[in-house]
Amino acid sequence: MNVVFAVKQYISKMIEDSGPGMKVLLMDKETTGIVSMVYTQSEILQKEVYLFERIDSQNREIMKHLKAICFLRPTKENVDSLIQELRRPKYSIYFIYFSNVISKSDVKSLAEADEQEVVAEVQEFYGDYIAVNPHLFSLNILGCCQGRNWDPAQLSRTTQGLTALLLSLKKCPMIRYQLSSEAAKRLGECVKQVISKEYELFEFRRTEVPPLLLILDRCDDAITPLLNQWTYQAMVHELLGINNNRIDLSRVPGISKDLREVVLSAENDEFYANNMYLNFAEIGSNIKNLMEDFQKKRPKEQQKLESIADMKAFVENYPQFKKMSGTVSKHVTVVGELSRLVSERNLLEVSEVEQELACQNDHSSALQNVKRLLQNPKVTEFDAVRLVMLYALHYERHSSNSLPGLIVDLRSKGVAEKYRKLVSAVVEYGGKRVRGSDLFSPKDAVAITKQFLKGLKGVENVYTQHQPFLHETLDHLIKGKLKENLYPYLGPSTLRDRPQDIIVFVIGGATYEEALTVYNLNRTTPGVRIVLGGTTIHNTKSFLEEVLASGLHSRSRESSQATSRSASRR
């Protein structure tokens, strides 16, 4: 179950099927992102694809010497653009691939437009999602719900993305969903409808234990996306932002022109692949080793250019040398900027208190520490408000709750009103009233003992004590202990055996910390394969945008106690 491999296979098959000769790859905005996540431009160039064009680009030239490979989402706009294209074809022959199921009527319209008979084939290749890591995918949708209900357009897109994922992995799953979320049940029903309607597509070889799709809602754990991160990939996303593997470094003081935007992709960057799940401290020493390795290779290459043979050897090694030099400067810059932000924003201290708020239950200590940090001028308004949010979520119903006082402290610190208002919005979004689970207190005697012992001996790393709630959910699922009254099956059948292939989908967005949890479970649990997906991949900033987009913050307390109004059609 490797989503990067699945999408890669589709794209290389498209290119192979078009045969030898020069080609153009014709895409839309979304499929451009889908392709760029798994292939670099230079890799595709090696496959005789010399031009990359957007179907919606108005000024494309006529190039009859090129074959066109079209990879498009089956939207009305794309079908209309293709109809126009086929009426006046710019290329010699067209191989058309849709990233999802296309209706018979659309295929008929395309056939009618193809008067010059330039279409060689029309196929469905189900690469309709963003493959982030081998076990992680996203749909790049921010703001999927209105209140507690789906935005209809986003429900449709999410259903398409999730069914495409199942088809690309050749899985016809049983479905379980989070009972406390109406949105999770609704998505499950939509996926089930597609499976029933397109049953021929889902007729895969039956496995002894059927695969399982588990649909969760971000509302059940609003803590995880609010925490600072200390593993490489998660930390880069939290502090710098990752957008389709691209990192914008243009704001870094004194940045050179060629490093204003860098790409971090485990597919093409060995250092990143080996370090993405390691702690920040380890990254520092690994960067040092990388630099030393680079330094060792560098003088040797330059000293020995005495004979023609030396020069030939250097030229042969140069692409690798140049690539290594690019890798070194990229990671040194990224890690340098992370270090600068950690120090400038006092993040070690901030993160320690965040972890206390997420993992411990000592109210007076937590309150004291939050108040102390709110007085610290180095703590930014963004970090100050996130600490208050974590406090508000954890101690929402504590008898000594001091949230009003902390809001006053935020105002005294000069925190903008838009941030202060977000505190109640986050509680409205993921507070105790809407959670189907208890995020904070240990559930059983074993867990209580573990927490007690942890408290006695201290934790190995104070900055990474927190484990996402997803860890416990998946642990119970793998052991066959996930309660059916909290996570019911959709439909009458239930799974007798422990699941082996699990697809988890989080409405409202997953996080890189959860992706790390899944990576570790895959590594340490033989016979179990888990893939995680979400409407998007959040950092704190995008999560707060998600909360704002839901519109829950704008309701008065009274109306929010009533049932959320139904989603209005946009």
Swiss-Prot record:
Organism lineage string: Eukaryota, Metazoa, Chordata, Craniata, Vertebrata
UniProt topology in membrane: Peripheral membrane protein
SUPFAM superfamilies (alphabetical): Sec1/munc18-like (SM) proteins (SSF56815)
Cited InterPro entries: Sec-1-like_dom1 (IPR043154), Sec-1-like_dom3a (IPR043127), Sec1-like (IPR001619), Sec1-like_dom2 (IPR027482), Sec1-like_sf (IPR036045)
Subunit details: Interacts with STX6 and ZFYVE20.
Keywords: Endosome, Golgi apparatus, Membrane, Phosphoprotein, Protein transport, Transport
Protein's recorded name: Vacuolar protein sorting-associated protein 45
Family indicated by similarity: Belongs to the STXBP/unc-18/SEC1 family.
Gene Ontology CC: endosome membrane; Golgi apparatus; Golgi membrane; membrane; synaptic vesicle
GO biological process, one term: vesicle-mediated transport
Localisation per UniProt entry: Golgi apparatus membrane; Endosome membrane
Tissues in which the UniProt entry reports expression: Ubiquitous; expression was highest in testis and in brain. Detected in every part of the brain.
Main localization of the protein described in the UniProt heading: Golgi
Modified residues (Phosphoserine): S307, S441
Organism of provenance: Rattus norvegicus (Rat)
Function: May play a role in vesicle-mediated protein trafficking from the Golgi stack through the trans-Golgi network.
Gene name of the encoded protein: Vps45
